[in-house]
Amino acid sequence: MLDTIKIIRAKLSQVADSQGLPLYDEREVRALADLLLEEVCGITRTNRLLHPERILTAEERARLSSIVARMEQGVPVQQALGYAWFYGMRFEVSPDVLVPRPETAELVDWIVTDLRSRPTSSSDVSSPVSKPLTICDIGTGSGCIAISLARCFEDARVLAIDVSSAALNIARRNACQQNVDNLHFAQIDVLEYVDNLDSNIGNTPQNNSFPQGYQHLDIIVSNPPYICQNEAAEMSEIVLEHEPEVALFVPDDDPLLFYRSIARLGQKHLKKGGFLYFEINAAFGEATCQLLGQMGYRNVELRRDIAGRDRMVKALYS
């Protein structure tokens, strides 16, 4: 029986190391074990260091055993827990949504920094800030981007859209959990919506249209599908088996599919002086910038993440 902190920490490390995550080095595996002990049992790092032989209670053992059993089946630790931390908040996750990742928090940081550094009113077309600020998060998933921005800008109006009703249900619960009420959700297929625009269809179907009050946007942000199908062989089986394929992959012959469609949507719905913010595939940073320039966007900026990879793009609509 795994009764002590020291022994169960070793077991958790063994499980994490064996479940197909070669990206985890020994330090990260230890951190994962420590995370579970803190999240599941409330045992802080200080307590672990001071009392490594402390006997876990029967309830603690049962809860940890359940988590470990799911991890042994290849379930990501966040899904085994049922939640992930993002931007200081706890978000429900499931196989219906992507697990929020640190590089996405960097994208949110960029937007927050930009908006807080600009005046609240300006005649300068380069400033998108108006009152109230109107933001749209396309492909919201768990809602981590939209909810974080809604919390940072409580007087803003934020629209979170996704093609998946299951994802939207999770995002709604997360918004409720965080007491965010300046957020509206809509089920919209962006690719279909843009196809209708480009086909000159007079009326977009009612169930696939932007709601009233969100027709003119200051900010569009998106972390859309951007992994080519031929990259799947290089990915962890844990991601492939437990995160939604629809949120991950694009055709090999059209890797910028969603960026082109969202940029086209921006041409219709962004205010003059509004901005696009994207998370991108590091392999297509320059190509994404070129695409936006060709579509009439200005001041296109490519930014690297903390790991030094091209990961984010910002562009001005004018």
Locate predicted features.
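A general structural signal for well-ordered alpha-helical segments in protein cores
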Residues: I5, A33-D34, L64, V77, ...
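Short, solvent-exposed loop/helix junctions and linker helices
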Residues: L2, T57-R61, L98-P102, D252-L256, ...
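Alpha-helical elements of Rossmann-like donor-binding domains used by nucleotide-donor carbohydrate transfer enzymes
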Residues: L35, R63-S66, E106, W110, ...
